[in-house]
């Protein structure tokens, strides 16, 4: 593991692409958390005595073997909420800027090409951040500035709208926002493939953050230890249909109740052993339940 201090914008600029693994929970920040970040950014931007504002860590591991000649996706173990929220704010700000820089490095084109896009790549490789299925198409639609998909992510749209409205209230006085964004600081934590245990690190990092739901914990426990292709197959064939069936609004509440009911049955007392030796059978049985 290697941990270094980094400015968020510098970190985004030099990184090619972040991918959120399918075992991660969906984007879950509320307006309250976005408002707190907004207030912190504006405060830092207005005060010369604040040189930096720390917003947390971003922990990642290379998805596969590093390739100099192409995009090398980084799997995000911790920091999805911060990365996604920052990109929603940057996208909203880019729509209020022209081609002239209002502050060093802050023009519509530079914000998009530095922090949101890989402008010389095509398809999904052309985007800095790929979220999980529930959120991915919504974020990409915003960045492409196209209509939202039919089953769009409410969190993505609501938080983007919040930032867009806050920026509109600033009028032409955008320099404090730009200065504040430039002061955001993270801890850049790169894991070593084959040496660090992503599951243990994920669990320890989330022990002090927003509590994971029962469904999130079970999904992570099942999928995180599997090979990527195995993860994808189980998620797309069985877990994703359950998420869709419960819907975005009811996922946490009703899916959690469902999981507690299912795992509370006497017939499931050996659930941990069952999941470890037969994850496919467990997920398929859960899907049919």
Task: Explain the meaning of each model-derived region.
Residues 1-77, 87, 184, 188:
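Short alpha-helix boundary/capping and kink motifs at helix termini
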Residues 2-17, 116-143, 174-176:
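Short, compositionally biased low-complexity segments
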Residues 29-34, 50-51, 81-82, 152-160:
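Phosphate/oxyanion-binding active-site loops and adjacent basic polyanion-contact surfaces
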Residues 47-48, 96-100, 208-212:
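Secondary-structure transition/capping motifs at alpha-helix termini
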Residues 53, 97-125, 129:
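Flexible phosphate/Mg2+-sensing switch loops adjacent to catalytic phosphate-binding sites
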Residues 58, 63-80, 119-152:
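Aromatic/His-enriched, Gly/Pro-containing loop or helix-boundary segments
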Residues 83-99:
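Short active-site loop/helix that positions an aromatic residue
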Residues 130-289:
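Polyanionic (Asp/Glu-rich) segments that form extended negatively charged tracts
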